[in-house]
């Protein structure tokens, strides 16, 4: 069903989303996942009670919520949001690079060493990591930089106590070189602000191109026992300009997302540093391809290993993601005082850090172990090599994008 004329006056209208259902996380994350919201139960017993009630009360008192607010609550509700209740890594729906192999953290440690050297070898050099999950990257990178002689300290930005406890246990004795804050507002330091697969969980405004280039926003409402999608006017005037830019490339009916939190986040990241770098690794694309290649948008939902059809069904029980618009992020970083470099793939970035040499060494070690009849050792090395190769696989993790930006610092080399 096409939107009715009521949408033009700013009143939300029921719409029928034409989104498909294609998995786009690792190993294959190239297509968007749509959702059919016509019959999604708001009373399912698996939906967290407090979150469900909060959403229903907000919609009842203020009307339909922009999808961005629904996504914020579903992921980050303090008691029932997805990231408030999940144990990092337990029942995960995909493997991140740090959880796949310790070699990712070891290679990233080389990047930190280059940064540390480029800004004059400060003591300490801080890594400020947002959304560190289990803490695998920190544990592996801290061990490697310690062997390199880099005086590294780690600052975790984590709002949930249970995740902090998990990270402390993962680090073990190295936790003595780390600290935990709830946001980026701590004392500014020299080092690097790091976010690995974090920005794709930033809540997004979902917009749809209407006739004559008009753009409308997706809202979420409750209708009886169901959450439903509605179309309405833009909820924030600051969306108008970027929405017009995207709509100029798209046909009526196409959808796209805008993350309104990126600008403020980049400002906070800049304020967290006296000098140093911003390092972002995530699924995403550049304009205009990110719009043209995903005409139904990129919002996707997952429960454990499975893609699920709707983010409106059982909020809090599943992850919700949207591909990162790295063109918009680079602009936000520049406005915040960073000097962004060209965006590259994780595959290209890891090649610059020596992954090919590591692969050769593992392959040679495995071959020699096999020649000597050390079957178990050869098997372990072969498995380690296979996992290393996955980091740069162009059909999977290697296709993640990497953005590095400097603040009052030279380009590392």
Regions found by a protein language model. Name each.
Residues 132, 161, 199, 285, ...:
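Short, glycine/acidic-enriched loop or turn micro-motifs at the edges of active sites
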Residues 240-413:
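Long, Lys/Arg- and hydrophobic-enriched amphipathic alpha-helices
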């Amino acid at each position: 069903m096409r939107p009715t004329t009521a949408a033009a006056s700013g009143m939300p209208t029921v719409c029928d989303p034409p989104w498909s259902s294609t998995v786009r996380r690792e190993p294959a994350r190239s297509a968007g996942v749509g959702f059919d919201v016509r019959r999604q139960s708001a009373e399912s017993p698996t939906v967290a009670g407090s979150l469900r009630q909060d959403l229903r009360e907000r919609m009842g008192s203020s009307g339909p919520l922009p999808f961005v607010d629904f996504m914020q609550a579903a992921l980050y509700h303090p008691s029932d949001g997805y990231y408030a209740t999940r144990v990092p890594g337990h029942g995960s729906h995909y493997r991140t690079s740090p959880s796949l192999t310790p070699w990712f953290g070891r290679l990233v440690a080389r990047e930190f060493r280059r940064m540390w050297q480029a800004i004059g070898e400060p003591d300490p050099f801080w890594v400020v990591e947002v959304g560190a999950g289990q803490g695998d990257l920190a544990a592996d990178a801290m061990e490697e930089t310690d062997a390199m002689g880099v005086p590294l300290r780690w600052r975790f930005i984590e709002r949930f106590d249970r995740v902090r406890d998990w990270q402390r246990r993962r680090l073990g004795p190295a936790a003595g070189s780390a600290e935990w804050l709830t946001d980026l507002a701590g004392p500014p330091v020299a080092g690097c602000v790091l976010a690995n697969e974090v920005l794709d969980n930033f809540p997004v405004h979902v917009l749809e191109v209407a006739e004559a280039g008009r753009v409308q926003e997706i809202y979420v409402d409750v209708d009886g026992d169901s959450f439903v999608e509605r179309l309405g006017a833009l909820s924030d005037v600051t969306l108008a300009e970027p929405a017009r830019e995207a709509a100029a490339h798209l046909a009526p009916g196409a959808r796209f997302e805008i993350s309104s939190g990126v600008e403020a986040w980049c400002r906070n990241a800049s304020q967290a540093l006296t000098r140093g770098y911003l390092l972002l690794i995530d699924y995403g694309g550049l304009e205009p391809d990110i719009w043209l290649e995903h005409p139904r948008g990129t919002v996707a939902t997952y429960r454990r290993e499975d893609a699920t059809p709707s983010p409106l069904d059982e909020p809090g029980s599943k992850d919700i993601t949207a591909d990162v618009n790295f063109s918009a992020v680079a602009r936000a970083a520049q406005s915040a005082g960073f000097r962004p470099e060209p965006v590259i793939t994780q595959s290209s970035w890891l090649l610059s850090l020596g992954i090919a040499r590591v692969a050769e060494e593992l392959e040679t070690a495995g071959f020699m172990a096999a020649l000597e009849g050390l079957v178990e050792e050869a098997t372990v090395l072969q498995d380690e090599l296979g996992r290393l190769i996955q980091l740069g696989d162009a059909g999977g993790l290697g296709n993640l994008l990497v953005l590095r930006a400097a603040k009052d610092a030279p380009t590392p080399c």
